[in-house]
From Swiss-Prot:
NCBIfam families given in the database record: GSH_gloB
EC number from the UniProt entry: 3.1.2.6
GO molecular function, one term: metal ion binding
GO biological process assignments: methylglyoxal catabolic process to D-lactate via S-lactoyl-glutathione
Protein keywords: Hydrolase, Metal-binding, Zinc
Function: Thiolesterase that catalyzes the hydrolysis of S-D-lactoyl-glutathione to form glutathione and D-lactic acid.
Enzyme type, top EC level: hydrolase
Name of the protein in its database record: Hydroxyacylglutathione hydrolase
Chain sites annotated for binding Zn(2+) 1: 55, 57, 113, 132
Species of the source: Methylobacterium sp. (strain 4-46)
UniProt catalytic activity: an S-(2-hydroxyacyl)glutathione + H2O = a 2-hydroxy carboxylate + glutathione + H(+)
Length: 255
């Protein structure tokens, strides 16, 4: 199994390093902040070979030029990001495979938060790097497309095994938990998860990774097919889940 380190960048971004112990190949998933990535590389002694970009937003790529200059890492980014990601060596689209030593990730195009967003899915290891598409107890803001586009992207995750580890690009767990409890107040799994989130934050940690099973049980944005969530937005049970999701996302925007 790969070695993975997570760490805080900027104010709420989550930096991630993944290393293949068989070959020493190591990737950063986005570079929100050069200093944090370089510090953790120094602490681990790992040598960075790759940077895998999930999307073009500044808070995910700001540190890319410095980290590439310091490490010589190869930068892979979504083809649809165009020139918005600096220092790109290779681009990827839906269905491409990215190799990190002996590890192989399938590239999913997961638009909704932004049009160029991709997820890196390591099927053998059951690990998904979801960027700003799926968060612990939440999902990304819809910025460039109708909300149903993000719902379609999120629906792809629902087909993955429950034990899949989900690494997201931000730690918004407390605000996400508050909204989730407002939308799904009678969910006992959610209540326990929200209490855990409070304890973890008090300890200076974060609930990343999460698992798909945990999110299916507690994340309102993955539960748009559930009668309780339809009722929460004033819709009848059995309503179109894309419409329920849209109403939930619009509610969260105002929350």
């Amino acid at each position: 199994m790969p070695e993975i380190r997570t760490f805080l960048c900027r104010s709420d971004n989550i930096g991630v390093l993944i290393r293949d112990p068989a070959t020493g190949a190591c990737a950063a998933i986005d570079v929100p902040e050069a200093g944090a990535v370089l510090r953790v590389l120094g602490e681990t002694g790992w040598s960075l070979t790759d940077i895998l970009v999930t999307h073009r937003h500044f808070d995910h790529v700001e540190g890319t030029p410095e980290v590439k200059a310091r490490t010589g890492a190869r930068v892979t980014a979504p083809a649809k990001a165009g020139d918005a990601v600096p220092e790109v060596d290779a681009t990827v689209r839906e269905g491409d495979a990215v190799r990190l030593g002996s590890l192989v990730a399938a590239v999913w195009e997961t638009p909704g938060h932004c049009a160029d967003h991709v997820t890196y899915w390591f099927e053998r290891e059951r690990i998904a790097f979801a960027g700003d598409t799926l968060f612990t107890l939440g999902c990304g803001r819809v910025m460039e497309s109708p909300p149903e586009v993000l719902w379609r992207s999120l629906s792809r995750f629902l087909a993955l095994p429950d034990e899949t580890a989900i690494y997201s690009g931000h730690d918004y767990v407390l605000s996400n938990a508050r909204f989730a409890l407002a939308a799904d107040p009678d969910n006992p799994n959610l209540k326990a998860r929200a209490e855990l989130a409070e304890r973890v934050k008090r300890d200076g940690r974060f609930l990343i990774p999460t698992t798909l099973g945990e999110e299916k049980a507690t994340n309102p944005f993955l539960r748009a097919t559930e009668p309780a969530l339809a009722r929460a937005v004033g819709m009848a049970p059995g309503s179109d889940p894309a419409a329920v999701f849209t109403a939930l996302r619009e509610w969260k925007n105002r929350f």
